[in-house]
Protein backbone atom coordinates (compact mmCIF):
# COMPACT_ATOMS: atom_id res chain seq x y z
CA UNK A 1 0.00 0.00 0.00
CA UNK A 2 1.45 3.31 -1.06
CA UNK A 3 2.15 5.75 1.76
CA UNK A 4 -0.31 8.62 2.11
CA UNK A 5 1.06 11.88 0.79
CA UNK A 6 0.03 15.05 2.59
CA UNK A 7 0.03 18.20 0.46
CA UNK A 8 1.13 20.93 2.84
CA UNK A 9 0.95 23.71 0.29
CA UNK A 10 -2.68 24.45 1.07
CA UNK A 11 -2.36 23.93 4.82
CA UNK A 12 0.50 26.36 5.44
CA UNK A 13 -1.58 29.56 5.08
CA UNK A 14 -4.17 28.16 7.49
CA UNK A 15 -1.44 27.20 9.97
CA UNK A 16 0.07 30.66 9.64
CA UNK A 17 -3.31 32.27 10.19
CA UNK A 18 -3.99 30.12 13.26
CA UNK A 19 -0.57 30.92 14.69
CA UNK A 20 -1.13 34.62 14.12
CA UNK A 21 -4.58 34.49 15.70
CA UNK A 22 -3.03 32.92 18.81
CA UNK A 23 -0.59 35.85 19.02
CA UNK A 24 -3.16 38.50 18.15
CA UNK A 25 -4.12 40.66 21.14
CA UNK A 26 -7.76 40.69 22.11
CA UNK A 27 -9.65 43.97 22.39
CA UNK A 28 -9.88 45.40 25.87
CA UNK A 29 -13.22 46.71 27.07
CA UNK A 30 -12.28 50.39 27.01
CA UNK A 31 -9.83 52.14 24.72
CA UNK A 32 -8.64 55.49 23.40
CA UNK A 33 -9.65 56.09 19.77
CA UNK A 34 -7.43 58.60 17.98
CA UNK A 35 -9.10 59.63 14.71
CA UNK A 36 -7.40 61.44 11.83
CA UNK A 37 -10.43 63.64 11.10
CA UNK A 38 -13.20 63.55 8.48
CA UNK A 39 -14.50 60.23 9.80
CA UNK A 40 -17.51 58.75 8.01
CA UNK A 41 -20.65 60.19 9.60
CA UNK A 42 -23.17 59.08 6.98
CA UNK A 43 -22.70 55.55 5.61
CA UNK A 44 -21.13 52.66 7.55
CA UNK A 45 -19.80 54.96 10.30
CA UNK A 46 -17.40 52.18 11.30
CA UNK A 47 -15.13 54.32 13.46
CA UNK A 48 -17.98 56.05 15.26
CA UNK A 49 -19.74 52.71 15.71
CA UNK A 50 -16.60 51.27 17.24
CA UNK A 51 -16.50 54.12 19.75
CA UNK A 52 -20.22 53.66 20.43
CA UNK A 53 -19.70 49.94 21.05
CA UNK A 54 -16.68 50.42 23.31
CA UNK A 55 -18.65 53.02 25.29
CA UNK A 56 -21.39 50.50 26.07
CA UNK A 57 -23.51 50.25 22.90
CA UNK A 58 -27.21 50.47 23.83
CA UNK A 59 -26.21 51.22 27.45
CA UNK A 60 -23.75 53.96 26.45
CA UNK A 61 -23.78 57.32 28.19
CA UNK A 62 -21.78 59.51 25.82
CA UNK A 63 -20.51 63.00 26.60
CA UNK A 64 -19.44 65.19 23.69
CA UNK A 65 -16.92 67.97 24.36
CA UNK A 66 -16.84 70.39 21.38
CA UNK A 67 -14.54 72.94 23.04
CA UNK A 68 -12.12 72.92 20.08
CA UNK A 69 -14.82 74.17 17.72
CA UNK A 70 -15.91 77.72 17.01
CA UNK A 71 -19.44 76.36 16.55
CA UNK A 72 -19.71 73.95 19.47
CA UNK A 73 -23.50 73.72 19.51
CA UNK A 74 -23.67 72.86 15.80
CA UNK A 75 -20.89 70.28 15.75
CA UNK A 76 -21.96 68.83 19.09
CA UNK A 77 -25.53 68.52 17.87
CA UNK A 78 -24.42 66.54 14.84
CA UNK A 79 -22.68 63.95 17.00
CA UNK A 80 -25.68 63.80 19.34
CA UNK A 81 -27.91 62.83 16.40
CA UNK A 82 -25.43 60.19 15.22
CA UNK A 83 -25.09 58.45 18.58
CA UNK A 84 -28.81 58.68 19.31
CA UNK A 85 -29.51 57.04 15.94
CA UNK A 86 -27.11 54.26 16.92
CA UNK A 87 -29.16 53.68 20.06
CA UNK A 88 -27.12 55.16 22.91
CA UNK A 89 -29.00 55.34 26.19
CA UNK A 90 -27.91 58.95 26.83
CA UNK A 91 -25.96 61.53 24.84
CA UNK A 92 -25.13 65.04 26.01
CA UNK A 93 -22.95 68.03 25.13
CA UNK A 94 -20.65 69.62 27.67
CA UNK A 95 -20.34 73.05 26.07
CA UNK A 96 -17.23 74.13 27.95
CA UNK A 97 -15.93 77.44 26.60
CA UNK A 98 -14.15 78.85 29.64
CA UNK A 99 -11.81 77.22 32.14
CA UNK A 100 -14.07 78.29 35.01
CA UNK A 101 -16.76 75.93 33.72
CA UNK A 102 -14.45 73.01 34.49
CA UNK A 103 -15.02 73.71 38.19
CA UNK A 104 -18.78 73.10 37.87
CA UNK A 105 -20.06 70.26 40.03
CA UNK A 106 -22.60 69.40 37.33
CA UNK A 107 -19.89 69.08 34.68
CA UNK A 108 -17.76 66.93 36.95
CA UNK A 109 -20.73 64.73 37.85
CA UNK A 110 -21.43 64.10 34.17
CA UNK A 111 -17.84 63.04 33.55
CA UNK A 112 -17.86 60.76 36.60
CA UNK A 113 -20.99 59.01 35.32
CA UNK A 114 -20.52 58.75 31.55
CA UNK A 115 -19.09 55.72 29.74
CA UNK A 116 -17.64 57.57 26.73
CA UNK A 117 -16.15 61.00 26.01
CA UNK A 118 -15.81 62.33 22.46
CA UNK A 119 -13.52 65.32 21.71
CA UNK A 120 -14.48 67.00 18.44
CA UNK A 121 -12.32 68.74 15.88
CA UNK A 122 -11.48 72.42 15.66
CA UNK A 123 -8.44 74.17 17.14
CA UNK A 124 -6.21 72.06 19.37
CA UNK A 125 -4.75 75.13 21.09
CA UNK A 126 -8.23 76.27 22.04
CA UNK A 127 -9.07 72.80 23.37
CA UNK A 128 -5.91 72.62 25.48
CA UNK A 129 -6.40 76.17 26.70
CA UNK A 130 -9.82 75.28 28.08
CA UNK A 131 -9.17 71.79 29.48
CA UNK A 132 -5.52 71.44 30.51
CA UNK A 133 -4.79 71.25 34.25
CA UNK A 134 -8.47 71.35 35.23
CA UNK A 135 -10.68 69.03 37.30
CA UNK A 136 -12.35 67.97 34.04
CA UNK A 137 -9.08 66.77 32.59
CA UNK A 138 -8.09 65.02 35.80
CA UNK A 139 -11.37 63.08 35.89
CA UNK A 140 -11.00 62.03 32.25
CA UNK A 141 -7.38 61.00 32.74
CA UNK A 142 -8.04 58.97 35.88
CA UNK A 143 -11.09 57.20 34.44
CA UNK A 144 -9.28 56.36 31.19
CA UNK A 145 -6.33 54.95 33.15
CA UNK A 146 -8.69 52.94 35.32
CA UNK A 147 -10.46 51.38 32.35
CA UNK A 148 -13.75 53.05 33.30
CA UNK A 149 -14.07 55.29 30.25
CA UNK A 150 -13.70 55.04 26.49
CA UNK A 151 -12.22 58.22 25.00
CA UNK A 152 -12.17 59.36 21.38
CA UNK A 153 -10.74 62.45 19.72
CA UNK A 154 -10.95 63.46 16.08
CA UNK A 155 -8.75 65.96 14.20
CA UNK A 156 -7.87 68.58 16.86
CA UNK A 157 -9.24 66.15 19.44
CA UNK A 158 -6.62 63.66 18.22
CA UNK A 159 -3.75 66.14 18.14
CA UNK A 160 -4.05 66.84 21.88
CA UNK A 161 -3.50 63.22 22.95
CA UNK A 162 0.27 63.44 23.45
CA UNK A 163 2.26 65.50 25.94
CA UNK A 164 4.12 67.14 23.05
CA UNK A 165 1.52 68.44 20.60
CA UNK A 166 1.71 69.63 17.01
CA UNK A 167 -0.10 72.96 17.21
CA UNK A 168 0.35 73.90 13.55
CA UNK A 169 2.88 74.23 10.78
CA UNK A 170 3.41 73.67 7.08
CA UNK A 171 2.89 70.80 4.68
CA UNK A 172 4.77 69.14 1.87
CA UNK A 173 8.22 70.54 2.60
CA UNK A 174 11.64 69.17 3.46
CA UNK A 175 11.81 68.52 7.23
CA UNK A 176 13.06 71.60 9.06
CA UNK A 177 12.53 73.22 12.44
CA UNK A 178 10.23 75.97 11.14
CA UNK A 179 7.90 73.42 9.55
CA UNK A 180 6.22 72.52 12.83
CA UNK A 181 4.88 74.53 15.77
CA UNK A 182 4.90 72.58 19.02
CA UNK A 183 2.93 73.11 22.22
CA UNK A 184 1.94 71.13 25.30
CA UNK A 185 -0.95 68.72 24.79
CA UNK A 186 -3.26 67.00 27.27
CA UNK A 187 -0.88 64.08 27.80
CA UNK A 188 -3.45 61.28 27.63
CA UNK A 189 -1.01 59.16 25.62
CA UNK A 190 2.23 60.94 26.58
CA UNK A 191 4.50 58.58 24.64
CA UNK A 192 3.30 59.82 21.23
CA UNK A 193 3.19 62.89 19.01
CA UNK A 194 0.05 62.77 16.86
CA UNK A 195 -0.54 64.39 13.48
CA UNK A 196 -3.90 64.13 11.72
CA UNK A 197 -5.27 64.55 8.16
CA UNK A 198 -1.86 63.03 7.56
CA UNK A 199 -1.30 61.86 3.98
CA UNK A 200 -4.33 63.89 2.90
CA UNK A 201 -2.39 67.08 3.70
CA UNK A 202 1.14 65.79 3.04
CA UNK A 203 2.35 66.12 6.63
CA UNK A 204 5.18 63.59 6.74
CA UNK A 205 7.81 66.34 6.78
CA UNK A 206 6.38 68.08 9.81
CA UNK A 207 5.92 64.84 11.77
CA UNK A 208 9.57 63.94 11.15
CA UNK A 209 10.51 67.48 12.23
CA UNK A 210 8.53 67.02 15.45
CA UNK A 211 10.13 63.65 16.18
CA UNK A 212 13.61 65.07 15.50
CA UNK A 213 12.93 67.70 18.16
CA UNK A 214 11.57 65.08 20.60
CA UNK A 215 13.35 61.79 19.81
CA UNK A 216 12.05 60.18 22.99
CA UNK A 217 8.51 60.17 21.51
CA UNK A 218 6.85 58.04 18.85
CA UNK A 219 5.40 59.88 15.84
CA UNK A 220 1.88 58.80 14.83
CA UNK A 221 0.40 60.16 11.58
CA UNK A 222 -3.27 59.30 11.01
CA UNK A 223 -5.10 59.70 7.71
CA UNK A 224 -8.65 61.00 7.37
CA UNK A 225 -11.46 58.51 8.09
CA UNK A 226 -8.85 56.38 9.86
CA UNK A 227 -8.44 55.56 13.52
CA UNK A 228 -5.66 54.28 15.76
CA UNK A 229 -7.35 52.37 18.58
CA UNK A 230 -5.06 52.38 21.63
CA UNK A 231 -5.91 49.42 23.85
CA UNK A 232 -5.13 49.41 27.56
CA UNK A 233 -2.61 46.58 27.11
CA UNK A 234 -0.34 48.69 24.88
CA UNK A 235 -1.55 47.52 21.48
CA UNK A 236 -2.63 49.93 18.76
CA UNK A 237 -4.97 48.68 16.02
CA UNK A 238 -5.92 50.44 12.78
CA UNK A 239 -9.49 51.00 11.60
CA UNK A 240 -10.84 52.91 8.63
CA UNK A 241 -10.04 53.62 5.02
CA UNK A 242 -6.54 55.08 5.19
CA UNK A 243 -3.30 54.31 6.95
CA UNK A 244 -1.50 55.06 10.19
CA UNK A 245 2.15 56.04 9.80
CA UNK A 246 4.51 55.34 12.68
CA UNK A 247 7.84 57.17 12.89
CA UNK A 248 9.94 55.33 15.46
CA UNK A 249 13.17 57.06 16.60
CA UNK A 250 14.16 54.33 19.08
CA UNK A 251 17.30 53.50 17.08
CA UNK A 252 18.06 57.09 16.02
CA UNK A 253 21.81 57.56 15.67
CA UNK A 254 22.11 61.22 14.69
CA UNK A 255 20.16 64.40 14.06
CA UNK A 256 21.40 67.93 13.45
CA UNK A 257 18.15 69.39 14.84
CA UNK A 258 19.73 71.16 17.85
CA UNK A 259 22.43 72.80 15.74
CA UNK A 260 20.86 74.14 12.52
CA UNK A 261 18.87 77.24 11.66
CA UNK A 262 15.09 77.17 11.63
CA UNK A 263 14.83 76.93 7.84
CA UNK A 264 17.75 74.61 7.20
CA UNK A 265 17.05 70.99 6.23
CA UNK A 266 17.19 68.41 8.98
CA UNK A 267 19.41 65.36 9.09
CA UNK A 268 17.76 62.41 10.83
CA UNK A 269 19.57 59.06 10.71
CA UNK A 270 18.20 55.57 11.31
CA UNK A 271 14.51 56.27 11.79
CA UNK A 272 12.24 53.25 11.56
CA UNK A 273 9.03 53.72 9.56
CA UNK A 274 5.85 51.61 9.59
CA UNK A 275 2.80 52.12 7.38
CA UNK A 276 -0.19 50.30 8.88
CA UNK A 277 -3.62 49.81 7.34
CA UNK A 278 -6.88 48.18 8.37
CA UNK A 279 -6.43 45.51 11.02
CA UNK A 280 -2.67 45.93 11.44
CA UNK A 281 -1.36 46.22 15.00
CA UNK A 282 1.60 47.84 16.72
CA UNK A 283 2.69 47.56 20.35
CA UNK A 284 3.47 50.93 21.85
CA UNK A 285 6.15 49.66 24.24
CA UNK A 286 7.52 46.50 22.63
CA UNK A 287 7.63 48.11 19.15
CA UNK A 288 6.15 44.86 17.78
CA UNK A 289 4.18 44.85 14.51
CA UNK A 290 1.47 42.31 13.65
CA UNK A 291 -0.26 42.17 10.25
CA UNK A 292 -4.01 41.84 9.97
CA UNK A 293 -5.06 38.18 10.11
CA UNK A 294 -7.20 38.50 6.99
CA UNK A 295 -4.13 39.52 4.98
CA UNK A 296 -2.76 35.95 5.03
CA UNK A 297 -3.98 34.19 1.89
CA UNK A 298 -3.15 31.07 -0.08
UniProtKB/Swiss-Prot annotation:
Pfam families assigned: Peptidase_S51
EC code(s) of this entry: 3.4.15.6
A Gene Ontology molecular function term of the record: serine-type peptidase activity
InterPro entries the record matches: Class_I_gatase-like (IPR029062), Peptidase_S51 (IPR005320), Peptidase_S51_cyanophycinase (IPR011811)
Taxonomy, superkingdom: Bacteria
Reactions mediated catalytically: [L-4-(L-arginin-2-N-yl)aspartate](n) + H2O = [L-4-(L-arginin-2-N-yl)aspartate](n-1) + L-4-(L-arginin-2-N-yl)aspartate
Keyword Nuclease part of the UniProt annotation: no
Enzyme class, first EC level, given as a word: hydrolase
A Gene Ontology biological process term: proteolysis
CDD domains: GAT1_cyanophycinase
Residues annotated as catalytic: 155 (charge relay system), 173 (charge relay system), 197 (charge relay system)
Stretches assigned to coiled coil: none
Keyword annotations of the record: Hydrolase, Protease, Serine protease
Function, as annotated: Exopeptidase that catalyzes the hydrolytic cleavage of multi-L-arginyl-poly-L-aspartic acid (cyanophycin; a water-insoluble reserve polymer) into aspartate-arginine dipeptides.
NCBIfam families for this protein: cyanophycinase (TIGR02069)
Family indicated by similarity: Belongs to the peptidase S51 family.
Protein known as: Cyanophycinase
Amino acid sequence: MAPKVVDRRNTMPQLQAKSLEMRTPQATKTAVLVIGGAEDKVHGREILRTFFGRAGASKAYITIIPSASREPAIIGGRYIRIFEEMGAEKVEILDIREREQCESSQVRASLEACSGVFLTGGDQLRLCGVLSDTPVMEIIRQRVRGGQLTLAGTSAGAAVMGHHMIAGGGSGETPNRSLVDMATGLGLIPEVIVDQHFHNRNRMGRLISAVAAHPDRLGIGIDEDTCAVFERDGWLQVLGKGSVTIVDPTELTHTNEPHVGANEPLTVHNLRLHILSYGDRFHLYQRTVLPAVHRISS
